[in-house]
């Protein structure tokens, strides 16, 4: 039996997150429903990450076993796109080893977070955090540098579901793409639940001048969620790319 991986994008606005749940719409649920329509049996998938409600993806990766041996990568891509709703799109498909699990095989995950400090654009309200205050980008960059490397990120996680809060952030870049549009790019192998959004919330506190950049070190050392700033809203976040 062949095993395929797919890279796909989705607009997270109308989903209750990635992971399948009963009685609500999820990305995994829609993906597996599409596979069931194609193969006339339930096909279960494994994904590289589980995004929260409202979070988007440009490069999510999932894998599944294909019960029809003759199907090609192009067949899989085309069949899925013909059966998926218009807020999910499969960009490519490829054959993988039978043991491939994208969650554990990933060597890097890249997240993008977009902040707009411009006047509110109602057409972009589900895709950027509209934040009507100027931010000190240089101060945010300095604060972000303290988060790079291996740390206990207990202060930036949600809940108590992670037994090991130690993670490694390879790099954080903060870019001004055009006037009033800011991109925060976070690269790491894996992340705790809501970790990127919690980091963004604290970097914004620095950008406002409410915290000095060095405050981030103190927050890390306290290892308590209460020490960090509030969580940035989900609609500015994108799972941009997963590397293997």
From Swiss-Prot:
Keywords: Isomerase, tRNA processing. It catalyses: uridine(38/39/40) in tRNA = pseudouridine(38/39/40) in tRNA. SUPFAM superfamilies: Pseudouridine synthase. Gene3D superfamilies: Pseudouridine synthase I, catalytic domain, C-terminal subdomain, Pseudouridine synthase I, catalytic domain, N-terminal subdomain. Its EC number is 5.4.99.12. Formation of pseudouridine at positions 38, 39 and 40 in the anticodon stem and loop of transfer RNAs. Belongs to the tRNA pseudouridine synthase TruA family. Homodimer. This is tRNA pseudouridine synthase A. It comes from Thermosipho africanus (strain TCF52B).
